[in-house]
Amino acid sequence: GMGLANLLYAPVLLLLRNVGLLTRSRSERDVLLDEPPQGLYDAVRLRERPVSGQDGEPRSPPGPFD
């Protein structure tokens, strides 16, 4: 049971140990930085509003669905 799980799990850990050292290629990094944001990032825009309410009490800033 557990011995078999360890024998199958250990090679996966050995393959994944260097994943953090991998870097993106230069061309992929340039493409990601050059493209404008798409989708939800375009739809959600912050609007400037006074943070205090009409009665002077502080309130939370508006959310994306206000």
UniProtKB/Swiss-Prot annotation:
Residues 16-66 are cytoplasmic. The chain crosses the membrane at residues 1-15. GO terms for biological process: neurotransmitter transport. The keyword Transcription does not apply. Residues 43-66 are annotated as: Disordered. It is a multi-pass membrane protein. It catalyses: acetylcholine(out) + 2 H(+)(in) = acetylcholine(in) + 2 H(+)(out); choline(in) + 2 H(+)(out) = choline(out) + 2 H(+)(in); serotonin(in) + 2 H(+)(out) = serotonin(out) + 2 H(+)(in). GO terms for cellular component: synaptic vesicle membrane. It is found in: Cytoplasmic vesicle, Secretory vesicle, Synaptic vesicle membrane. Keywords: Cytoplasmic vesicle, Membrane, Neurotransmitter transport, Synapse, Transmembrane, Transmembrane helix, Transport. Belongs to the major facilitator superfamily. Vesicular transporter family. Electrogenic antiporter that exchanges one cholinergic neurotransmitter, acetylcholine or choline, with two intravesicular protons across the membrane of synaptic vesicles. Uses the electrochemical proton gradient established by the V-type proton-pump ATPase to store neurotransmitters inside the vesicles prior to their release via exocytosis. Determines cholinergic vesicular quantal size at presynaptic nerve terminals in developing neuro-muscular junctions with an impact on motor neuron differentiation and innervation pattern. Interacts with SEC14L1. This is Vesicular acetylcholine transporter. It comes from Macaca fuscata fuscata. The lineage of its organism: Eukaryota, Metazoa, Chordata, Craniata, Vertebrata.
